[in-house]
């Protein structure tokens, strides 16, 4: 439980740092005819942390949502300008900062996890990484939803990188409804599945 809290705090801090970056560098409201002019404003956002992915069938036939700590953030498309009037955000600027925001999130999360004792490796594009001590086989097992989407794309003869719109459509059309389960049940199920795949939490220590 103590380690779990540290992980959750690390992820929350990475989310905050990312929002702070966008608020500082990419937050502008439209002004004037056609919204052609814009001025600096501050974002208003609501964050909703989730601990799992959508349910999917795993290689051993089990069906459950994988451990997948993430945060959904909703940014209000309104902001108060300097003269107290309200305007819509210049969303193009926000989209232009997408890659920088992703890199900030990943680098902050990596630093925070390292600070509490985790190692990181397999650093990929835009700063993505894996936790040292967790091999590719266990990552693949606990990525059933991702594999499900990947297989659907393969059947269509493409990939998410080549066909992002199709990937988004498949993601929406194949997702199962989340089942409301207590965290204790979730954690117990994940531990059982991990042990069945010869993984022990002690491997990370």
What are these regions (language model features)?
Residues 1-205:
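Beta->alpha loop/short-helix hinge microenvironment recognizer with preference
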């Amino acid at each position: 439980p103590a380690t779990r809290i540290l992980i959750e705090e690390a992820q929350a801090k990475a989310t905050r740092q990312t929002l702070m970056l966008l608020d500082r560098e990419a937050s502008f409201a439209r002004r004037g005819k056609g919204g052609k002019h814009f001025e600096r404003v501050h974002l208003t956002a609501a964050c909703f942390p989730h601990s799992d992915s959508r349910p999917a069938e795993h290689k051993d036939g089990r069906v459950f949502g994988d451990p997948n700590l993430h945060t959904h953030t909703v940014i209000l498309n309104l902001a108060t300008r300097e003269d107290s009037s309200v305007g819509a955000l210049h969303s193009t600027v926000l989209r232009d900062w997408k890659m920088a925001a992703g890199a900030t999130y990943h680098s902050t999360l990596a630093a925070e996890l390292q600070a509490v004792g985790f190692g990181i490796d397999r650093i990929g594009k835009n700063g993505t990484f894996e936790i040292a001590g967790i091999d590719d086989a266990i990552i693949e097992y606990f990525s059933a939803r991702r594999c499900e989407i990947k297989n659907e794309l393969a059947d269509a003869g493409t990939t998410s990188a080549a066909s992002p719109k199709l990937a988004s459509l498949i993601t929406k059309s194949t997702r199962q409804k989340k089942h409301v389960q207590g965290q204790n049940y979730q954690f117990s199920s994940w531990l059982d599945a991990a042990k069945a795949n010869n993984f022990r939490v002690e491997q990370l220590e």
